[in-house]
UniProtKB/Swiss-Prot annotation:
Cysteine pairs bridged by disulfides in the record: none
InterPro entries to which the protein is assigned, alphabetical: AMMECR1, AMMECR1_dom_sf, AMMECR1_domain, AMMECR1_N
Gene3D superfamilies found in the cross-reference section: Hypothetical protein ph0010, domain 1, Hypothetical protein ph0010, domain 2
Phylogenetic lineage: Eukaryota, Fungi, Dikarya, Ascomycota, Saccharomycotina
UniProt name for this protein: Uncharacterized protein KLLA0D02464g
AMMECR1 domain segment(s): 5-220
Amino acid sequence: MSLETSSPYAFYAFYQLYSQFYRVPKITLETVNDFLYQGKGLKPEFARSPLFVTWKKLKKGEYQLRGCIGTFSEGKIEEGLKRYALISALQDSRFTPIEREELSQLRCGCNLLSQFKTIYSSEGTGNSGDIWNWEIGKHGIEIKFRHPKTNSRMSATFLPEVIPEQGWDQRETFENLIEKAGCWNYLEEVMKHWEKYFDEVIRYEGTKSEIAWDEFETGLSTVAEAE
């Protein structure tokens, strides 16, 4: 995983939420890049990209998760940022919608995903691959598996930065993925016989950038002058 302190992507995502609470002109991602990042912040390889937008709120000196939603579908980056900046801020079912009074305490992260590789699959004549073929701190992980009782298909993912933040090893990562998917009652069963229940394990990499309120607020005046 590579980490940039700020980028046009993160600023643009924050701007989408800000515009929900204040009347501001519509701007393009290119405008942000030109006026705040000297035209050098956009990367051609991410013109279309899967992405996740993460919101964290400063509380007791630490930033704590306030919302995170994204997509593995590859779409136009500007449209994806518009959509998932708001969905993650206002529609993450784990949290209440972010309110205007919280803006000054927020940090917005944007993770652009790439290098997807299926490292294990149960399809075909037999199981193939290695579920351990990934590196903590470099890869995000998505698993797809069958519920032991209902046989329904379940899935969950953790972005590359989540695993080292939590201090998990590889096995603990899979255990927490199973729990996240809603299968906590059968965690031990699934892990003990993962060859039976796992359908697919996919690793991927992320390029993450973040922007906190102070930097975002400073950039607002520059963008306003551009319009």
